[in-house]
C-alpha cells in the first residue's frame, strides 16, 4: 500500500547506512536526486481555503480531551512560520484555544520564534490541521538546515507537495490541509498553558 511504502521510506531515511555512502558515495545519489527533484509545487487555492469561516475558533472541531484540561487543544497542529530571510518552517507545537480569537502556541524559546521575539515584532503564523501523513512526519523530523519540511514531505510521498499562499499572512501553507487558521504571534503577549 502507499502508506506502507511511505513508512518504509521514513525508516530508511531515518537510519541511513552512512558507512555505505562513505565507501560508495554514488549509492547516496538517489536520495540527493530525490531531494533536488521535490521542491514544493505552488498552486492557486488549497482545500482548506474553499470555505471561509468567521473569526471564531470555538466553532472548529477542536477537542477538549480530558475533563480537567485547561481548554481545547488542536490535535497534530502543523504550525507554519518563516524567518527574516523568508525561509519557511513547519513544526508541531501544542496549540490551546483560549477564546474565539486567541490560540496559544507552546514555543521553545530558543527556536524559530526567538528571532521575532528579540526584535519585538509580530510573527505571521498559520496553524494547519490535516494533510498527508508525510507532512505530519516531516513537521516533527530533525532536518538539516538546507532541506525544508515541504521538500522532505515530497521525498517521502514521491511527489512535489502542493502549497498555496495563505489568505491573510505572507506564508505558503500546505494546499491539502483541511483547516487553515491564520494569524500572528505577538511576543509581548504570553499566557499560562494548561492545566493538564
Positions of predicted regions on the chain:
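Extended, highly charged
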Residues: 1-196
